[in-house]
Amino acid sequence: VVSVIAALGLGRLISLPFSGPLSDKFGRRLSGIIGVICYAAYFMGIAFAPSMGVAYAFAIVGGIANSFLDTCVSPTCMEIYVNNPSVANLFTKFSICLSQFLLPFLIGIVASANMSYKTIFIVAGIAILIDGILILILPFPARKKAVQAKADKKKSGHKISPAAIAAILIGFTSSSTFMLWLNCNQELARSYGMADPSKIQSLYALGTATAILATAAFIKKGLKEINVLILYPLISTIMLALCYFIQAPFICLVGGFVIGYAGAGGVLQLAVSTTAEFFPENKGTATSLVMIASSIANYTILSLAGYITKVGGSSAPRMILLLNMAVTIIGILLALFVKKNRNK
C-alpha cells in the first residue's frame, strides 16, 4: 500500500512540470480530459491489477491524472469566478473534504453488502468518466486569444520575481504543516497517554471543513489572501508549541481541530491563488509550480520525519513537532516577504 501511495506521488512529480504549461497553451478542457482518462485507467487498473508491479504502474498513471486535473480545475475555477478566485479555489478543497467524509461510509456499505473491494474502484471509474463527459460538452470560460497572450508575454517577459518564488515555496511549507501533523499525530497522542487517537482525525476533518467555509466568508468580507497566509500558519505554530509543552491527551484533540483549521483549511489553495497573481495568463503553470513544491514536501519532509522516528525513540513525536514549527515559521516569513514585495 505504501509503495502504491509513493507511486502516486511519483506520477505527480513526473507530470506537473508540463501539465500546467499544457493547460495554459491548449486549454483547460484538454488538461481535464487527459486527467479523466488517466484516472479512469488508474481506477480500473488498480481494481484488476494481477500483480504489485502492474498496480504500481497504474498508481503512477493515477498521479499523472491528479496533476492534470489540478491544472484544469483550479485555473478554471479562478477564471469562472474572476471577482472571487480565491474563494472559488477554496471550494475545490471543500469538495475534497466532502468526498473524504463520504468515502468511509461508502466503504462500509460495500463491506456490509459483502461486495468486492473492487466495487469502489469501478464506481469511481464510472463517476470520473461521467465527469469527463461533462468537461467535454460544457462551456469553459473564455480566455485571451493566443495572439494577445503572446503579446502580453513578450511585453512582460514573465520574469519570476523573488516574491513569486516565495509564494511558490509556501506550497512547500503549507503542505509540510498539515502532512507532518496528519502522519504523526497518532504517535504523539499515544506518547501522551491517549487511549483512542483516532478521535483526532475526526476533529481534524471538522476543523478543515470549518476553515474553508469561514475563510471564504472572511475573504468575501475583505480579508486579503496574503494575510490569511500569515495568520493561519501563525495560529498553527502557536498550536504546535502548545502541543509540545502541554503533554496531556486533551491537547492533541484541540490540536487536531486547530491544525485542521489553520494548517489544512485551504492555505495551500490560497498559495495557488496568490501565485497565480504573478502569472495572470498562466494560471495552469502557477498551479503546477505550487503543486511541485507541495509534492517535494510530501517526499522530503515525511522522509525526514521517518528518519527522526527511527533515531529519536520515545522523543521522536515531540522532535517532529519542533520540525513542524520550524517549517511553519519559515512559511510565515515567506508570506511576509510576499506581502512586502508583491508589487515590486
Model-derived segments and their meaning:
Residues F68-Y81, G265-F279:
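Intracellular juxtamembrane helix-capping segments at the cytosolic ends
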